[in-house]
């Protein structure tokens, strides 16, 4: 009996080796997946194998579905629900305890395109911010560096937040648009997240629901609510994009979608691009103090429709005036001849004054990448009827060297000549663009920061309602605050 046991025990390694060899040399899903991984890693430079991006790449491939050969992000929310259910079941078992987590904190946020002061906070200190990869957050006292940001929900089906607004008729109602359209192009660093539509809260952000009618809107570039004779009307910029060679087309089309029933139904309001059967793709929506709606455009997937400003008092189909003079001006340029993105900023204290930033770019013949700069800054003194050029910040078009990505403007609440713009850094003009002050320096991040440090790439500039001094800035490094925006050097 003892000899049989010894013999059986000695055969165990042989059996295990055979199983390993069978698994190794049997063609199948595992082998195909190994070949897929080898192919992917072979294209990655490995000079620094312990660098953060290599760790992130490893984490990425650990979550790839071998059959799909991509990360099935559409399953994330279901996986979260399953994990939560298992944890709840575990809590009922004898001796089990819930997992406890301790927040470690961070002194830098990620790319933040959506920034909003909370209209319901009597103290005027609460703010909201949306990250393009990190979801929606709020801070009960954004004026204090010690006040922590709180996540709304880490497990929304989509954490790519691009824009946010509230209803001026009912400030308890908030809207959040998902999907980051401005990087959803063939560019040197594709980093776009496809959206799932528009989220809505009717209790000042305590709870949220996804509006079912918007689930085919792939990218929401901007969202505003207008008070139309005491009724709330939503305007959403809906566009399409491309990510890693795959086009994500919003349905039924790009355009400015209008809803007068809280988002239950929508109508596309913009005209078609000149010479096309597709509506303009909105990059920015601006509502002036008298209610006039302005829309700045961006290129669509067909590379059409950029560098255009539209305005309307009614906001409905057939009511729009189109200003596209700068298409021909840009196309006549020797280098930066592709009409780009348009950003708008109206003066709260003077409905006649509106500013427009217009980008212009080119497409690389060698890579196919889209590039764009800050082509022009315009001002209108008659509510968009006519426009004239102002000076650009020092350095010309390079002040906004990534205007497809980082491009923003804001006008002081009480001075129509005081204008902030943002590209790579923050700039300010106190005389309607005649001259400019360079206020921030992103490179100070390498030297410990300081009072002039704001992270690179400006995406949001928001004054607190009625205050010319308090202002929030959204950038690739999170949210920055100043309490003296009206000074020469905040």
Which sequence ranges carry the predicted segments?
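Extracellular glycan-interacting surfaces
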Residues: 2-490
